[in-house]
C-alpha cells in the first residue's frame, strides 16, 4: 500500500489532450511532506508513517509538538497526518515525500473539507422540492410535514431539516491524475475536489479500483 501526501488546492483550469478535447483539472500544490514519525508492527502494532506539511513560525506551535518535530529534524509544521503502509521500513525520519510518488493516469482519492455555506433551508441543503409559488399558496419553501401527530408525538432522529450546510469532511473517490509536475510539486487532477482555493487536501491512492 502506497502512502499519501498532503497538499493545498490552488484552483481549477483546463488542459487539452492530443485530440484537442478540453479536460477540466484541479491544480494541487503537494508537499514536500517530511516524515516525522515511523511506526512498525513490532513497536506499535501496525505499520504507518506520520508526515508533516505546511511550514510555520516556531512560535505558532506548542513545546510538545516542537519537541516531537525535532526528533526528525523537521521545521515547524502546521499539519500532521498518519498514513498506513504495508512496510514502514522503506521510510526514514526526515525523508521528504514529493509529488513524484504519483504518476499520470493513476487513480486517487481526495479528502478535504467542503465549502461552508452557513445556515441553509431544505431546498438548498437536502434538494427538496418547493410548494406552489402563486394562486394564494402560503407554502413556498416551507419544509412540510415533519412527522405524525400524537403517535409518536415526537420528530424522529435523523429527520432532514434546515441547518448548517457544508464545512464537513468529504472524500471524492477514483479521480484521475492527468499530469505530474515533479519540479514544482504540482498535481493536475481531473475534475473538482472539495474545498475552496487554499484549503488543505489529503491525496491517497484509490482504495476501490474498478467499476
UniProtKB/Swiss-Prot annotation:
Q: What is the phylogenetic placement of the source species in the record?
A: Bacteria, Bacillati, Cyanobacteriota, Cyanophyceae, Nostocales
Q: From the UniProt record, which GO molecular function terms apply?
A: rRNA binding; structural constituent of ribosome
Family matches, as PANTHER family: 50S RIBOSOMAL PROTEIN L3, LARGE RIBOSOMAL SUBUNIT PROTEIN UL3C
Species: Trichormus variabilis (strain ATCC 29413 / PCC 7937)
Indicate yes or no for the key word rRNA-binding.
yes
Tell me the protein's name.
Large ribosomal subunit protein uL3
Q: Quaternary structure?
A: Part of the 50S ribosomal subunit. Forms a cluster with proteins L14 and L19.
Family matches, as InterPro entries: Ribosomal_uL3 (IPR000597), Ribosomal_uL3_bac/org-type (IPR019927), Ribosomal_uL3_CS (IPR019926), Transl_B-barrel_sf (IPR009000)
**One BP term from GO:** translation
Q: Its GO CC terms?
A: cytosolic large ribosomal subunit
